Amino acid sequence: MINNEKAVNNKRSTDGGKLFRSQVKFVAGAMNINQIPNFSLPEIAFVGKSNVGKSSLINTICNNKNLAKVSNTPGRTRQINFFNLADKLIIVDLPGYGFAHVPISVKEQWEVLISYYLRNSHNLRLVNLLIDSRRGIKENDQKVAELLLANKREFQIIFTKSDKVIDCKNLNNEVQNFLATLNYSCNVMYVSSRSKEGARALKASLAKCIKA
């Protein structure tokens, strides 16, 4: 199901906007599985390849450009970062996958950390699988999607940096074929941290997790 701001009703958009105008703060970081905290609040996670724009997107929807550290260098996020939104939601920023320019041991550590969290979090309500609009769906993205399905995790696909793509027709076809292969149906959104395209619809979808 392709989703955009027009497809989300006004009530949901308003609820999402109100929630994400609330106070949000960093509450924990985990560099290994033993450091992962157990919150009593519902969690929403952002996962994707290195430099896909996870931190920028989190800053955009939370209206705080300094919340999650942003870098043009892939592999900047080296731990799981947890943010508390108004004592109603925990936003989870996962390390990027697929970054080659780190020692193999570090890369494996990140993969174990990401996989463990996605498999074992008791409060995880929704995973946002971020994919660079300019690059399309890659093998690593498919592996993560398959991991989520195997563990019965609900997810939606977020194409980032949509302002840099003129025609999304090919992407639409690609993602529909991808979902058909997985035998899965979910929201698909196009967002841009620069132009704010899609931010409102994304906030509305995340706000629904409070009642899930």
UniProtKB/Swiss-Prot annotation:
GO biological process, alphabetically ordered: division septum assembly
Which residues does the record give as Mg(2+) binding sites? S55, T77
Q: Carries keyword Metal-binding? A: yes
Q: Which Pfam families match?
A: MMR_HSR1
Q: Which residues bind GTP?
A: 48-55, 75-79, 93-96, 160-163, 191-193
Start and end of every EngB-type G domain? 40-212
Give the similarity note: Belongs to the TRAFAC class TrmE-Era-EngA-EngB-Septin-like GTPase superfamily. EngB GTPase family.
Which HAMAP family did the record assign?
Answer: GTPase_EngB
NCBIfam families referenced in this protein's UniProt entry, alphabetically: GTPase_YsxC (TIGR03598)
The job of this chain, per UniProt, is described as: Necessary for normal cell division and for the maintenance of normal septation.
Q: What's the name of the protein?
A: Probable GTP-binding protein EngB
Organism for this UniProt entry: Rickettsia akari (strain Hartford)
Q: What is the lineage of its organism?
A: Bacteria, Pseudomonadati, Pseudomonadota, Alphaproteobacteria, Rickettsiales
| Encoding gene, per UniProt annotation | engB
